[in-house]
Amino acid sequence: MDEMEDFFENDELDREPSPMGDEAIEDNSGEGGTRRVVEPKLLRTKRLANPRLALNERILTGPKGISALRETLKDFKPNPKDDPYANLEKLMKKYAYWGHLMFPKMKTEDVLNRVETLGTRRQVKVFMIKHRLGETGEDSEHEEQENQKNGIIDDGASDNDDDLFKDLPEKEVTTEKAKNSEKSDQKTAEIDENVEEEYRMMEEERLREEQEAKEAADEDALMEDFGDMNNDW
């Protein structure tokens, strides 16, 4: 019996170290008081090396979004003498190129559907108004990115309430805001009128082309009927 105990004791001494090191524990709760080593399971934490990006308002209003689309379509002039479908195909190729540069992981159809959905968001609407007025807001966006990069959060905690309103002229500020608001409303109304006028002209052009295509089809049908009559004679 002593020889068996010596054998097992030596086996315990000669056992290779556990890969878990100090985390291995001994369990003495088995039957007969036998000792066995119980190693805890490895806990694998799921970490995302590259978080999944989504096409959102920030990307659409960024440098690769609407601003890039305007540059892409800047030199595009459809030829009224060409086939409308050919002009449409050229336009869609430019949209596809823009969508690929903005968000390469999505198909063109999905990008356009997503852009249509984002167009109803307040942030995108405000950006469009500012963009039409020539106020892109790149400086404020750049400043915000720099603050986020440096870990600076402006919560107004360091501002003194007395200093905030110390040099604030009440009447002048109110009058200036009212004037700026009126100018902004006038510019927005002018832009809306221009957009409506362009849309009306495009709609008239489309109807005219449809009418011409219909008349051409009627003439072709008439010529075919005339040819059939000659063949019958």
UniProtKB/Swiss-Prot annotation:
Its cellular-component GO annotations read: chromatin; cytoplasm; nucleus; replication fork protection complex
Keyword Zinc among UniProt keywords: no
Q: Which GO terms describe its molecular function?
A: DNA binding
Q: Where is this region: Disordered?
A: 1-39, 134-233
Instruction: Report biased composition (Acidic residues) as residue ranges.
Output: 1-14, 217-227
A Gene Ontology biological process term: replication fork arrest
Keywords from UniProt, A to Z, are: Cell cycle, Cell division, Cytoplasm, DNA damage, Mitosis, Nucleus
Q: List the disulfide bonds.
A: none
Cellular compartments annotated:
Cytoplasm; Nucleus
Residue ranges annotated as compositionally biased, kind Basic and acidic residues, are 163-190, 197-216
Q: Which domain of life is it from?
A: Eukaryota
Q: What family is reported?
A: Belongs to the CSM3 family.
Q: What does this protein do?
A: Required for normal progression of S-phase. Important for cell survival after DNA damage or replication stress.
Protein name as it appears in the record = Protein TIPIN homolog
Organism taxonomic ancestry: Eukaryota, Metazoa, Ecdysozoa, Nematoda, Chromadorea
